Amino acid sequence: MERVEGWLIDADYETIGGKAVVRLWCKDDQGIFVAYDYNFDPYFYVIGVDEDILKNAATSTRREVIKLKSFEKAQLKTLGREVEGYIVYAHHPQHVPKLRDYLSQFGDVREADIPFAYRYLIDKDLACMDGIAIEGEKQGGVIRSYKIEKVERIPRMEFPELKMLVFDCEMLSSFGMPEPEKDPIIVISVKTNDDDEIILTGDERKIISDFVKLIKSYDPDIIVGYNQDAFDWPYLRKRAERWNIPLDVGRDGSNVVFRGGRPKITGRLNVDLYDIAMRISDIKIKKLENVAEFLGTKIEIADIEAKDIYRYWSRGEKEKVLNYARQDAINTYLIAKELLPMHYELSKMIRLPVDDVTRMGRGKQVDWLLLSEAKKIGEIAPNPPEHAESYEGAFVLEPERGLHENVACLDFASMYPSIMIAFNISPDTYGCRDDCYEAPEVGHKFRKSPDGFFKRILRMLIEKRRELKVELKNLSPESSEYKLLDIKQQTLKVLTNSFYGYMGWNLARWYCHPCAEATTAWGRHFIRTSAKIAESMGFKVLYGDTDSIFVTKAGMTKEDVDRLIDKLHEELPIQIEVDEYYSAIFFVEKKRYAGLTEDGRLVVKGLEVRRGDWCELAKKVQREVIEVILKEKNPEKALSLVKDVILRIKEGKVSLEEVVIYKGLTKKPSKYESMQAHVKAALKAREMGIIYPVSSKIGYVIVKGSGNIGDRAYPIDLIEDFDGENLRIKTKSGIEIKKLDKDYYIDNQIIPSVLRILERFGYTEASLKGSSQMSLDSFFS
């Protein structure tokens, strides 16, 4: 028997002799190895099912009759209460769904939806991206492998050094989105973390064949792309089928398989960075270049865009296209280096492989964390609810009109987790009768002791984060240890702050409507109480929202703010800290404001400048208006700036890039009930043979003519030229000349993007179109 230590990378199972065998993909200094456990059976729980039913339980498929392998009586615990039930074992994981459906007719079936290999990770206390020790017999085979006799987790600070391969495909389409049925792949650009940059081009058959060979020879642990799950991999599969090339890049020689529309590569992680970008709410347009720009990693080495590929390739200027492909691969690689470390840590915390973690929303991540913690204390998980109820949200104080100087924003750090801990809010503490905490307004009661399931986990997460932050103070921010610990504390913060939303999520196993409702009720109470305390100390509360308040007072100093915070700490059981000092700030309405921090940064929250469905010119003018008001305190100049832009549109002095509007296609155009402008633009493109896949950003412009806005929306892929006035548009009948709808851009883009801001300073729509002038003095607080 040998002992081998390494990192756990992935977990799945293989059917050997009719039995499901857990397969662990691990890595040590020698490389990849596989460990097999033959001694683990799929199982789930049932409550309220008679033993006779279990003895005779049978269901069937077309191929076989499915029966239980065995069952055993067990004392189970659910929401802290003891109940009698059974542990039910199946012959194979594929039998579990049928058995679950059959037995759910007779009682309560629990935890029958946990994938077999992930059940193994929970039961054995193992975690992907963490250390693992295996004792067992070494077996033969191409890949070093072991038969598990004993397995255990070895906690490690660092992450494994994964071999990464990033790739991006470029296709040749005469216009619009390429179609795999007819448009060939002309380039696959690759970058690895060994600093290799490889461009595969030439004959398509050779490109695909060389790409498969490259994956096999480089043997990456993780393959990364941007939107490759929905686009590159399906496209590659179609084109490979055309040439009879197997995509057999799995470490066991298997082909890429698609499960639920997701590519799975055996023994390799497959991460789509687009999934991560979709959860970053501050990135409104999810294009690769926008994400890179947001993260500060963007490099620009190409002088063409995607829409130019056909033109340059077909006239022989292939180097420009190759440079563009290289740029995409490098940007994808740099985004991966920025975003993946936190997901490595999340993988370690919730046990699952990184590629699964990147595809999950926060609620599902919390769900898996809770499943692991429940196992440790002998709890079985509830089932998600059949439906969820709504509840009143956070209390919002109406914002004060005008421009304000010398303002402090006080942040109620992790307010909702703090409330949950302070009042022991948890599904297993709800429904208390004696010695309870009672939520204001809603009256829900929670027992004071013992600690509930959520409170114990939240305390653990917060305490771990507190310990890490203490360690960080003693380290250099440039050290590798600091960076690792910082990733860990950020990950803990993300999970901690996700608990509140999880309680009201309709797919949560531990869904608890009263818990979520009570938490927001206490939150509203604390915001109101904080405002009253601040006012009693001479502060003016300008705005309050969810977990922060904005305060000011004549001659306010930081010492004044510190005294206020001390007083709030005396009265309230939550941590409060200064989020930002603003030298100037204005509020447009609830959840919408812009401020200039004391160190000169512009902070914009909830305004259209950060939205994706406005043209570039509207976003630019709004940002300039905000800057002029905050930095120069001159709304008249801001007004003049808007008038200049309106004049420029009228005189035809705008570029195509300035007037294009982008909006995402969230489903097939035929599935939309209401035909929005971007949908009709996509349909016009389809008439010309351009098919936009779901998740594409449709760029379109609005032209003059009859009909509604959608009737006059044309995709930029059909536009050949634009001179500021006239657009040359490809149609079935040839090139048509259409005029830009200047009135639409003035009335529905430019003016709406700034009007709500300028209205706060006394201006009207007529002011923007006319010559009204105002002074700022009457609006300055």
UniProtKB/Swiss-Prot annotation:
<keyword id="KW-0238">DNA-binding</keyword>
<dbReference type="Pfam" id="PF00136">
    <property type="entry name" value="DNA_pol_B"/>
</dbReference>
<dbReference type="GO" id="GO:0000166">
    <property type="term" value="F:nucleotide binding"/>
</dbReference>
<keyword id="KW-0239">DNA-directed DNA polymerase</keyword>
<dbReference type="InterPro" id="IPR023211">
    <property type="entry name" value="DNA_pol_palm_dom_sf"/>
</dbReference>
<dbReference type="InterPro" id="IPR012337">
    <property type="entry name" value="RNaseH-like_sf"/>
</dbReference>
<keyword id="KW-0548">Nucleotidyltransferase</keyword>
<comment type="similarity">
    <text>Belongs to the DNA polymerase type-B family.</text>
</comment>
<dbReference type="Pfam" id="PF03104">
    <property type="entry name" value="DNA_pol_B_exo1"/>
</dbReference>
<keyword id="KW-0235">DNA replication</keyword>
<dbReference type="InterPro" id="IPR043502">
    <property type="entry name" value="DNA/RNA_pol_sf"/>
</dbReference>
<dbReference type="InterPro" id="IPR042087">
    <property type="entry name" value="DNA_pol_B_thumb"/>
</dbReference>
<dbReference type="GO" id="GO:0003677">
    <property type="term" value="F:DNA binding"/>
</dbReference>
<dbReference type="InterPro" id="IPR006133">
    <property type="entry name" value="DNA-dir_DNA_pol_B_exonuc"/>
</dbReference>
<keyword id="KW-0808">Transferase</keyword>
<dbReference type="InterPro" id="IPR006172">
    <property type="entry name" value="DNA-dir_DNA_pol_B"/>
</dbReference>
<dbReference type="GO" id="GO:0003887">
    <property type="term" value="F:DNA-directed DNA polymerase activity"/>
</dbReference>
<dbReference type="InterPro" id="IPR017964">
    <property type="entry name" value="DNA-dir_DNA_pol_B_CS"/>
</dbReference>
<dbReference type="InterPro" id="IPR006134">
    <property type="entry name" value="DNA-dir_DNA_pol_B_multi_dom"/>
</dbReference>
<dbReference type="InterPro" id="IPR036397">
    <property type="entry name" value="RNaseH_sf"/>
</dbReference>
<dbReference type="InterPro" id="IPR050240">
    <property type="entry name" value="DNA_pol_type-B"/>
</dbReference>
<protein>
    <recommendedName>
        <fullName>DNA polymerase</fullName>
        <ecNumber>2.7.7.7</ecNumber>
    </recommendedName>
</protein>
<dbReference type="GO" id="GO:0006261">
    <property type="term" value="P:DNA-templated DNA replication"/>
</dbReference>
